[in-house]
Amino acid sequence: MLVGRVLEAAGTGVMWPVLQITVFSIYPLSRRGFAMGTVGMAMSVAPAIGPTLGGWQTDANGWRSIFLTMTVIGVVSLLAAMFGLHNFGSHDPSARADFFSVSLSVIGFGGLMFGFTNSETYGFTAPVTWGPMVVGLIGIVWFVLRNLRAGKRYREAVAKDKSALPQPPLLDLEVLKNRSFTVGTITASLAFFAFSSILVIMPLYIQTDRGYSATMSGLIMLPGAIGQCVSQFFGGRAMDRFGARPVALFGSIVLTLGTLGMSLVAMDTWIWWVSICQFIRQIGMGFLLMPITTWSLNCLNGPSEVSAGSSVTNTARQIAGAVGAPVLVILMETFAALHKQGGASAVAASIFGIQWALRISTMICLAMVLMVFFGVKGDGAGRTRDIISLRALRERRARRMAAN
């Protein structure tokens, strides 16, 4: 099962950056918000119906039936890709991946995630927790230093116009020197950190603490997923018209308010209050994620930087999402244990822990609002047509200076 999940994650990890690069290569700047919004809407269809179908399948046929369904979907997707997709643009058949860096990334990020996952069961003081985390951190540091050196050698060779170029870095971290891209990447990572943890915590509240079935849990979460599907589409269109700053600020505020409302859940809360708050949260997520991602990649120069930026931002978001769930679950269990020591029942202690985990998630969302307010500005944060006019003006000035 673990090997299967690794293969699933590897396939997904490859497809999403390639999809982003394709959109940025095909669509002009004036249409990228719309294109990314459409892509986001399509990518949200499965999360919209997945929990409901998964809950129904689990109740009816057991959890193994979910993987059978995924196998059928994977085969259909493979056939569609084989017969419906074709390459575009130039490509280099001689390009080779840096497999040593790939190994370092697997050891580094895998060890870190494995340690965080074990911390839920064994605590941070257990060797099975801190051991993999130490190995993972060493692997990540080695990976970063190796790719920084490889990037420096590659750029020096390109600048000297050498015929034989050295191997490019697996992950070009130089894009993080772009302030706007870094702000966008951190903002999206915070959103994933705060958001993914709720997808773990709230089913525990619905099923374990309130006693509802897995199917009912999926139905409660369904409206939010549909809301994100729609809001990502309109968020992309709104970015083209109004710019990234107002749309992302609106989305981050809505996400914060929804998380704050969800932190008010109690033992006797109307169960559909969870659905309403999750709907509000995912509306905010849709209006935040696509505009901030599109804006941060728009601030990079050329296809090579966009390709590197897409890989970096997706890596950062996946790490944040993977770390966010175990960290907040650990905090939830810690608060629950403290409350239980005071004489509370198991259910009351669990809900107390969930409330505090959601309050911490609200604080993270508030930090994200401040980052958008103070960080999303300058070139690329305004309306798309203003960005195009500004870039055209800069190009004309550069041509005049070159002519003189």
Regions found by a protein language model. Give the residues of each.
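Long, low-complexity inter-transmembrane loops of multi-pass membrane transporters
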Residues: 140-167, 389-404
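Intracellular terminal tails of multi-pass secondary transporters
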Residues: 356, 373-404
